[in-house]
Amino acid sequence: MSASSSGGSPRFPSCGKNGVTSLTQKKVLRAPCGAPSVTVTKSHKRGMKGDTVNVRRSVRVKTKNPPRCLEITPPSSEKLVSVMRLSDLSTEDDDSGHCKMNRYDKKIDSLMNAVGCLKSEVKMQKGERQMAKRFLEERKEELEEVAHELAETEHENTVLRHNIERMKEEKDYTILQKKHLQQEKECLMSKLVEAEMDGAAAAKQVMALKDTIGKLKTEKQMTCTDINTLARQKELLLQKLSTFEETNRTLRDLLREQHCKEDSERLMEQQGALLKRLAEADSEKARLLLLLQDKDKEVEELLQEIQCEKAQAKTASELSKSMESMRGHLQAQLRSKEAENSRLCMQIKNLERSGNQHKAEVEAIMEQLKELKQKGDRDKESLKKAIRAQKERAEKSEEYAEQLHVQLADKDLYVAEALSTLESWRSRYNQVVKDKGDLELEIIVLNDRVTDLVNQQQTLEEKMREDRDSLVERLHRQTAEYSAFKLENERLKASFAPMEDKLNQAHLEVQQLKASVKNYEGMIDNYKSQVMKTRLEADEVAAQLERCDKENKILKDEMNKEIEAARRQFQSQLADLQQLPDILKITEAKLAECQDQLQGYERKNIDLTAIISDLRSRVRDWQKGSHELTRAGARIPR
């Protein structure tokens, strides 16, 4: 805050981009860091006696410890003001500032709503992660049960292998038995042929015996030859029957042995079929073990992918936290800019009031000038009529009047210089307003970037949610496939072509997931580049604040130079006016006022140093905020 003047021209400080202290009518400003408050009153006084014109401005500084606040009172309407037109000031900036503030409030509300939505989505993601963890634990339990069943089937398979080895040994032994059985079959066939021949002979003998018995029945007389033939046929029949019985007995024995051998052969064939089935079961078991290993690998890959998703969710939450911190920082900047805007509006209103007061004081001074000129003319005429003897004194007074006219011309030049300085300060004020507009545009751009980052985070979360849903669906599918594999393992039926196709599809999906992970890494790199850009912008703002600090120092030096020039000028005027006894009292009063003004300037310098220290502390706070931004950008994982 600056209220210094040189020759009646008001001086305004260049406003920094972090904060601007304003001059308001009876406004209380809290001093930073617990410093005692200071009350500043501004008054402008212009007095003239005869043909002299003097433009002065006094700044009175009073310290008040009890309220500990900075109180600024406006100048009185009876004192001198600087020349400022009301047409130069308008309330359009105030209206536009209020509109922008409303827009910023709406944007902040939308950002708060977006952050609330993000928090709710993060909670939903946490619940989904817990559900996924429970689902994975259930799947792990099922896998453990399947592993236990596989261990039992392996034990059964080992027992079957031992039995198969024994059967193979018995098979080697039965090859010789088969050869022996072949020989026995040939022998049996020959025995069967003999038995058939014996049976045919016995049948013929029985037929012959029947014929002879029939003949005997018809003849009813038996000769010795008939008796002999009957005896012979009977003996032959008995022999044939005995041989037939022997062959039949041997044939039955052979048939019994053959049936036993056939039963043993059937058992061997059944054993061979069982061996084949066991071999097929072993091959199927090996295939199922390979498939189980592949499924275990896929489950591990899915767990790794879930861990990657968790890491991505953590990075997304960290990004949301950094965005919240950035949003808070931007809100603080926005509030500081709003306060700065309100201070500038109050300062403009105070300047309008001071301009009106200055106009009134200028008119009063012009009337005093006219009255003083008329009075001087009357005094001259009275002096010419009353005191003709004092010509030398009159000549001296005329010379002094000429000097006063010269001084009046100098004062007019001084007033013109004050007007030029006022114009320069007005241009600086316009530049400050322009810089403020640039800062507001930068804030709008930063808000747009924040919204873009929020949108990108939402798209990332949607993609992650879709990938997680696809992973859960794949887990369901794989569990269903695993149950199908379990049933096929129990039934020992093989057709694994569709499973191989599904495995190929799973590999393709894994490759697609890897590609999506690469895309996520690229998006994270983009976020890092955006954080670097914001860091560079923060550095630029810090550099602008440093430039503002330098400008404040330059203004302080210029103000000190102007104070010294005013002091010298008033001292020279005092030396000139001491020669005149009539205006001695006026010059003494002016000297006292000049001394008060010098003291006010010195106190103003103290206030300016306090303001500069405040600005430096704000610059440090800004640098701390930029360092926090850099730390937040460094926290983002690569």
Swiss-Prot record:
GO cellular component, one term: sperm flagellum
Record-listed Phosphothreonine modification sites: 73, 91, 212
Coiled-coil segments on the chain, per record: 125-198, 226-404, 442-616
Residues modified to Phosphoserine: 76, 87, 90, 96, 110, 120, 242, 613
Subcellular location: Cytoplasm, Cytoskeleton, Microtubule organizing center, Centrosome; Cell projection, Cilium; Cytoplasm, Cytoskeleton, Microtubule organizing center, Centrosome, Centriole; Cytoplasm, Cytoskeleton, Spindle pole
An individual GO BP term: spermatogenesis
Primary residence: cytoplasm
Highest taxon listed in the record's lineage: Eukaryota
InterPro entries noted in UniProt: Odf2-rel
Region: Disordered, residue numbers: 373-396
PTM remark: Tyrosine phosphorylated. Phosphorylated on Ser-76 by TSSK4.
Role according to the record: Seems to be a major component of sperm tail outer dense fibers (ODF). ODFs are filamentous structures located on the outside of the axoneme in the midpiece and principal piece of the mammalian sperm tail and may help to maintain the passive elastic structures and elastic recoil of the sperm tail. May have a modulating influence on sperm motility. Functions as a general scaffold protein that is specifically localized at the distal/subdistal appendages of mother centrioles. Component of the centrosome matrix required for the localization of PLK1 and NIN to the centrosomes.
Subunit text: Self-associates. Associates with microtubules and forms a fibrillar structure partially linked to the microtubule network. Interacts via its C-terminus with PLK1. Interacts with ODF1. Localized at the distal/subdistal appendages of mother centrioles. Interacts with MARK4; the interaction is required for localization of ODF2 to centrioles. Interacts with TSSK4. Interacts with AKNA. Interacts with QRICH2. Interacts with CFAP58. Interacts with BBOF1. Interacts with CCDC38. Interacts with CCDC42.
Name of the protein: Outer dense fiber protein 2
Native organism: Macaca fascicularis (Crab-eating macaque)
